A protein has these predicted regions:
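Hydrophobic alpha-helical connector segments
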Residues: 58, 71-100, 139, 144, ...
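N-terminal intrinsically disordered/low-complexity leader segments
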Residues: 1-7, 189-202
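Short, basic, alpha-helical segments at the C-terminal edge of helix-turn-helix-like DNA-binding modules
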Residues: 60-66
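Amphipathic alpha-helical interaction segments
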Residues: 83, 87, 107, 149-156, ...
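Amphipathic C-terminal alpha-helical segment
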Residues: 95, 111, 135, 155-173, ...
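Helix-turn-helix
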Residues: 11, 15-58
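Amphipathic alpha-helical packing segments from all-alpha helical-bundle domains
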Residues: 68, 115-140, 149, 179-186
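Amphipathic alpha-helical segments used for helix-helix packing
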Residues: 83-84, 96-120
């Protein structure tokens, strides 16, 4: 079992996370990371003997642990699908600071290769979120293929909205995404709603 982080370690990882979110993995220099943590480079290397990659690995592990606890677990938890997605919307809003925080997975992904140091973990994270969203859509009554399509679209909208927030310097795209997420996963297909309306007026 991994040794629990101390509060000091949690704060250190949080400060490193902000640098990677703002600058990206390749752009983050040791000088930037040291300045953000308030430690000298030698002290950082003492904490992280394998350097920047180890720092990013711990940041990613902490983020994925948070996601498992606050996103994946509620999606599979108790309550109606609507209640669970409402909790997830609230937690996503907090994690991404209402769209002001960039997507860590995107900022750690290598632009040059599909086999970067974090590629496997990032892929698993996306697949886990798609699977969790898909299960919720299935529980709401959608067919497997429809549920998968809704889940993939929801994940695309999540990360696309964060990219737009960063580019536009506005949190509006993320707020629009959060408002639309319950409907993206749970709402009846428009064709079904139209058929019900037609039957009602027959």
């Amino acid at each position: 079992m991994a040794r629990p982080q101390t509060i000091e370690e949690q704060e250190l990882v949080g400060r490193l996370s902000r640098v990677f979110r703002d600058i990206g993995y390749e752009g983050a220099s040791l000088a930037m990371l040291a300045a953000a943590t308030g430690l000298k480079k030698a002290s950082l290397y003492h904490r992280f003997p394998h350097g920047k990659q180890q720092m990013a690995e711990q940041v990613l592990a902490a983020a994925l642990s948070w996601y498992a606890t606050n996103i994946l677990s509620p999606l599979a938890g108790q309550g109606s699908p609507a209640e669970r997605i409402a909790m997830v919307v609230k937690n996503l809003d907090a994690f991404y600071a209402s769209g002001r925080q960039a997507c860590l997975l995107n900022m750690l992904a290598s632009p040059h290769t599909d086999n970067g140091p974090f590629a496997a973990a990032i892929q698993r994270a996306f697949e886990a979120l798609i699977k969790a969203f898909m299960a919720l859509a299935r529980e709401a009554g959608h067919a497997p293929a429809e549920s998968r399509a809704r889940a993939e679209r929801a994940v695309m909208l999540l990360h696309g909205s964060l990219v737009m927030c960063r580019g536009l310097r506005s949190s509006k795209p993320f707020r629009v995404f959060l408002a639309a997420l319950p409907g993206e996963l749970l709402a009846e297909p428009r064709s079904s709603r139209n058929r019900k309306i037609a039957i009602g007026h027959a």
